[in-house]
Amino acid sequence: MARSGYTLPVFACAAAIAALQRLRQPAASIQSVDCHLIDPDQTVAIAIEQVAPLSPDRALAICRSDPGDNLDLTRGTPIWAEVQLSPRSPDQDSLAIEAGEGIGHSETGPAIYDYAQRLLRANLLPLLQTNEQLTVRLILPEGRRLAERTANAAFGVVEGLSLLGTHGVAEALSAPEQLQVFRDRLRQLSADPDLVIFCIGENGLDLSQKIGLPRDRQLKTANWLGPLLVEAGLLGIPRILLFGYHGKLLKLAGSIFHTHHHVADARREILAAYAIAAGASLEQVRSLLDFPTVDAATQYLDQTDPALASRLWPQIAEAIVDRSQAYIRRYSEQIPEIGVVLFGRDRQLLTASSQAQTWLTNRAIAQPLRYPSA
């Protein structure tokens, strides 16, 4: 059975708890701390690797990431939390959270997102006196290096990793056993003939909720898109909305239905092929293939030929629909309607298939599309 672990914010929070405990109890042995996950509503013990006082009012603690049986590059990476206690004035917040080395940042600030903020506040505020302020500085010593191997830059996060997540448990999404969990969830959703929303990854899940798509109809798919599309067909689910980052769902336009990069990655080649169909010149296609990432290629088109981009992305969305239905047709006589919504690195909606646009309109979700379908 695949083993679940915890998301990065949990280990950051545990390190902060341990550092604060060291200030409260300088002589105590701290091997682990209890951390309330909020979502799910449970308290778990998190191992602490090291903890040390730095001064009478400052301490440092270290955890190591354990994401369970996942293909996760943060496995074993250290997470440091440096805390400092100081007197609090009436106009100050009791908790100040700072991003240190290895924590990424975007145009809006440090990449310490909502769940991480709530987790820190829920666990640390009850430990403070009313006249105390705690400053927590989170550090990922290997964060800058690891970020080079992620898609963080595609979402505007640079110089480090993000503390992203909507819950505390890191399910073993890459393990075969997790596919069965997803199938069981899909069977539950099939009891209601309403739309089922396949959210590709944590960013897809988070953004779909923020724009108002119904949470109770969402299924986080990880990279198991092919098997889950087939399962949806076999279950007779009538409508599926694929909602995800354009650099991930682009693979479906090339009939790649297991989207983990360890399996296959031809995104630039797929983009170039559809660009030719949309009228790109040979020089433009060569430029697209020369860029290191799909995101860089997308920005190039946005800036140099928005007319081409406005043709290209809706065509890709429709191609994803066609290829997905063709894939289901191999295994099932029941073919659901499929809609596609793609978002970009700025977490704004890039384009949508014509069917998806209709569904969004019918649900009164008035999110603008950069490149709407004709």
UniProtKB/Swiss-Prot annotation:
It comes from the Bacteria. It catalyses: Co-precorrin-5B + S-adenosyl-L-methionine = Co-precorrin-6A + S-adenosyl-L-homocysteine. SUPFAM superfamilies: CbiD-like. Its EC number is 2.1.1.195. The keyword Calcium does not apply. This is Cobalt-precorrin-5B C(1)-methyltransferase. GO terms for biological process: anaerobic cobalamin biosynthetic process; methylation. Keywords: Cobalamin biosynthesis, Methyltransferase, S-adenosyl-L-methionine, Transferase. Belongs to the CbiD family. Transmembrane segments: none annotated. GO terms for molecular function: cobalt-precorrin-5B C1-methyltransferase activity. The gene is cbiD.
